[in-house]
């Protein structure tokens, strides 16, 4: 007599249980935060966000410079449409 997929179902149930336990641990229990105080985590996260914002600002400036380079330098004005 075989039991079918009982082993697979038990494995899935155990993985779900472990994932729920990991969620409940909070920020200090996560792998990336192990051994760090709350202040250290906040400083690390602030540094990461600062770097991301600097990259975004540089990208925005580069796009603005490219748009300005492609823009027409002399605007044509039709005096009859003024």
Swiss-Prot record:
Disulfide bonds: none annotated. GO terms for biological process: protein destabilization. It is found in: Cytoplasm, Cytosol; Nucleus. It comes from the Eukaryota. Residues 1-23 have a biased composition (Basic and acidic residues). Disruption phenotype: Suppresses protein aggregation and toxicity caused by protein aggregates. Residues 1-41, 63-82 are annotated as: Disordered. Keywords: Cytoplasm, Nucleus. GO terms for cellular component: cytosol; nucleus. InterPro entries: SERF-like_N. Positive regulator of protein aggregation and age-related proteotoxicity. Induces conformational changes in aggregation-prone proteins, driving them into compact formations preceding the formation of aggregates. Belongs to the SERF family. This is Modifier of protein aggregation 4.
């Amino acid at each position: 007599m075989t039991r079918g997929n009982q082993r697979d179902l038990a494995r899935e149930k155990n993985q779900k249980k472990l994932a729920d336990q990991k969620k409940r641990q909070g920020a200090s229990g996560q792998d990336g935060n192990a051994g760090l105080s709350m202040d250290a985590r906040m400083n690390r996260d602030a540094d990461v966000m600062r770097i991301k914002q600097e990259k975004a600002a540089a990208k925005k400036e580069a796009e603005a410079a490219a748009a300005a380079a492609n823009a027409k330098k002399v605007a044509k004005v039709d005096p009859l449409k003024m």
